[in-house]
Amino acid sequence: MERQLEAYCAHLRNERQVSEHTLLAYRRDLEKVIEYCNTQGIAGWGALQIQQLRQLIARQHHQGQSSRSLARLLSAVRGLYRYLNREGLCQHDPASGLSAPKGERRLPKVLDTDRALQLLDGGVDDDFIARRDQAILELFYSSGLRLSELTNLDLEHLDLAAGLVQVLGKGGKARVLPVGRKAREAMQQWLRLRGIGGPRDGAVFISRQGNRLGPRAIQMRVKAAGERELGQHLHPHMLRHSFASHVLESSQDLRAVQEMLGHADISTTQIYTHLDFQHLAAVYDSAHPRAKRSKGTDS
């Protein structure tokens, strides 16, 4: 089983070009299945049956695994069996027809518009670190980039004159995104201080030593900005969520937001409609004369 898992991981890395983060998550999930099979005396992937996989899912659920984690595990198993079937190594899929236990869908945390502007409109010193960090914040919020997409940006991916940036998303899929006026200005100010010829690679966001900033360093800079400007915890994905929520709230164009976020399935994007409804419901409750609740009543 381990040998076939290694072959599948090599297929994901070399042919599907999945990210190392996704590859590691799938490997961990499939190693859990192997561990379970070993304890149950199941000799190989071809011997694993649907009722046994259902038992594993139930056990993981009782141990506190979230519905999202279990859905990912089942996705990893389905992907493996598709590969095994295609290679002629197996002729069934025990995950077919199985679904993860349903759980509460947590809505993503977002900044409201006023808080986003408070974060971005603070004064910026004209120095290397301040200009770089401001450009990072503006680009996250302007274009809805994932952390990995911003980390991997090279100078050749920018066309600030046209207000565009090209990113490489999940599964190696490229997409071109608009860059707003404020973000373009912040990027131009940063590139002026960054210099074009000095650093040894073409990374857009670099350290003083000329090295590409890694994901952890960018997370820490965003966190520091959140604490300094807002007095709250802030992470890159919250800026992506805020971008999506605010664009959807203004445009009501779910398909456009899906394309900008790089979601393969529109159901992933639809979670932002729940956020928009929350906002509308709050406005209604506070503004409609027949909606205002009397003090001390629950209905």
From Swiss-Prot:
GO terms for biological process: cell division; chromosome segregation; DNA transposition. The keyword DNA-binding applies. Gene3D superfamilies: 1.10.150.130, Intergrase catalytic core. GO terms for cellular component: cytoplasm. One of its GO terms (molecular function) is DNA binding. The keyword Ligase does not apply. It is found in: Cytoplasm. Keywords: Cell cycle, Cell division, Chromosome partition, Cytoplasm, DNA integration, DNA recombination, DNA-binding. Residues 106-285 form the Tyr recombinase domain. Residues 1-85 form the Core-binding (CB) domain. The active site is at R146, K170, H237, R240, H263, Y272. Pfam families: Phage_int_SAM_1, Phage_integrase. Belongs to the 'phage' integrase family. XerC subfamily. Forms a cyclic heterotetrameric complex composed of two molecules of XerC and two molecules of XerD. Site-specific tyrosine recombinase, which acts by catalyzing the cutting and rejoining of the recombining DNA molecules. The XerC-XerD complex is essential to convert dimers of the bacterial chromosome into monomers to permit their segregation at cell division. It also contributes to the segregational stability of plasmids. PANTHER family: PHAGE INTEGRASE-RELATED, TYROSINE RECOMBINASE XERC. This is Tyrosine recombinase XerC. It comes from Pseudomonas putida (strain W619).
